[in-house]
Swiss-Prot record:
GO terms for molecular function: 4-hydroxy-tetrahydrodipicolinate reductase; NAD binding; NADP binding; oxidoreductase activity, acting on CH or CH2 groups, NAD or NADP as acceptor. Belongs to the DapB family. SUPFAM superfamilies: Glyceraldehyde-3-phosphate dehydrogenase-like, C-terminal domain, NAD(P)-binding Rossmann-fold domains. This is 4-hydroxy-tetrahydrodipicolinate reductase. The active site is at residues 158, 162. One of its GO terms (cellular component) is cytosol. NADP(+) binds at residue 38. It holds the Pfam family DapB_C. It comes from Shewanella sp. (strain ANA-3). Pathway: Amino-acid biosynthesis; L-lysine biosynthesis via DAP pathway; (S)-tetrahydrodipicolinate from L-aspartate: step 4/4. HAMAP family: DapB. Its main location: cytoplasm.
Amino acid sequence: MGGQVRVAIVGAGGRMGRTLIESAYHQEHIRLGAAIERPGSSLVGVDAGELVGVGKLNVIIMDSLDYATDDFDVLIDFTAPEASIVHLDWCVRHKKAMVIGTTGFNHAQKEQINAFAEQTPVVMAPNMSVGVNLMWKLLELAAEVMGDYTDIEIIEGHHRYKKDAPSGTALKMGEVIAKTLGRDLEKCAVYGREGITGERDRETIGFATVRAGDLVGEHTAMFADIGERLEITHKASSRMTFANGAMRAAHWLVEQKPGLYDMQQVLGLN
């Protein structure tokens, strides 16, 4: 799309919401059309630009999408699973596209998203960063070459406030590796180890989780053999990388037909 894409951001007052507002401000092809907070928030009525320190944008934080129906083309949501489902339902009814960066969806919620995406364009990805999406491609190659004879472990770390574990990015890493190797992640995943576990089963994929301080996001996949190991690591030092990826997804999504897309498609990696 040649012109500016208007975006709305829900959860505007949160850590990620504020970063998204700042990212939208700096994007040439994006314009912030609306910013939404929960009813009762002390931020309702505040100018979104002044909230994040970029100056007045004349976009006042509101407490309902219903007040912003004509102000945006794509909704960007990094909130919580239950809220994201409600917002997607709203987007379907009002013919709006949606970018979902929320993680922690259960199986039933994912099925709801699949059904809604038949009626409106949706990009959903556990991680919007370019580097992470490239990492998933590298994991495919590593799994093809080394996966059958190495022990595979995935280690991830995030800030103390993150609510779901393992992270959506770590689970996607496991899914990519398992699919490449013809395994079912639900059957081969091992989440943490404690006590007398016995010898390691080569077919398993292990997960370890760290929650500490202000870690933005660190992910490592280890392919370990006797005598050598390969580690593929991505470290995020700022949430801005995720926000910029979400803006890129929004700009791409506005011209797509209804369907469920991911960042691999946005970036042309598929």
